[in-house]
Amino acid sequence: MSVHLPDINVWLALAFEGHEHHRTAVEWFDTLNPRGCAFCRFTQQGFLRLSTNPAVMKGDVVTMAEAWKNYDALLGDGRVFFSQEPDGLEQNWRRRTRDRGYSHRTWSDAYLVAFAETAGFVNVSFDRGFTAYDATNPLVLE
């Protein structure tokens, strides 16, 4: 049984019906086994931060209290759990960023790739950029 580590955009798509990828995210999510999907501190914080950002969420923006409620609803689903950082994550993250050129996504994408690889999870994203990292086999939702 695979454990999946969705990026922030997948979590937003799952939680908000108005998200352009909501249907795709829900169809994927409905195939998961219990404890088959993990939040990490980075995706938790990003989900909360972006849920409350009017520039990102437009008419779907929520209050901080509502963001916590949405997070708790996701976490309360038997398919979802919170994963602590695995041992060895920082070394893997450093290795994945040491020789890369700058991009505004390098730090976060490399962190999620390193987290999934170190924990034995599968990255999940709508972003094909995750396929650029060697030794990973991300699930790109379309």
Predicted feature locations:
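Short loop/helix-cap segments at secondary-structure boundaries that form the rim of catalytic
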Residues: F130-T136
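Short, conserved alpha-helical segments within structured domains
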Residues: F42-G46, S108
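Short acidic-hydrophobic, aromatic-tinged amphipathic segments that line or gate anion-handling sites
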Residues: F82-Q84, L139-E142
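Generic alpha-helical structural context detector
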Residues: A13, L48-R49, D72
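A generic "structured core" feature
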Residues: G36, N92-R94, N137-P138
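Short, well-structured N-terminal submotif of metal-dependent ribonuclease cores
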Residues: M1-F39, P54-E66
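Histidine- and aromatic-rich ligand-binding microenvironments
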Residues: D7, R105-T106, D127, E142
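Active-site neighborhoods of divalent-metal-dependent phosphate/nucleic-acid chemistry enzymes
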Residues: G76-V124
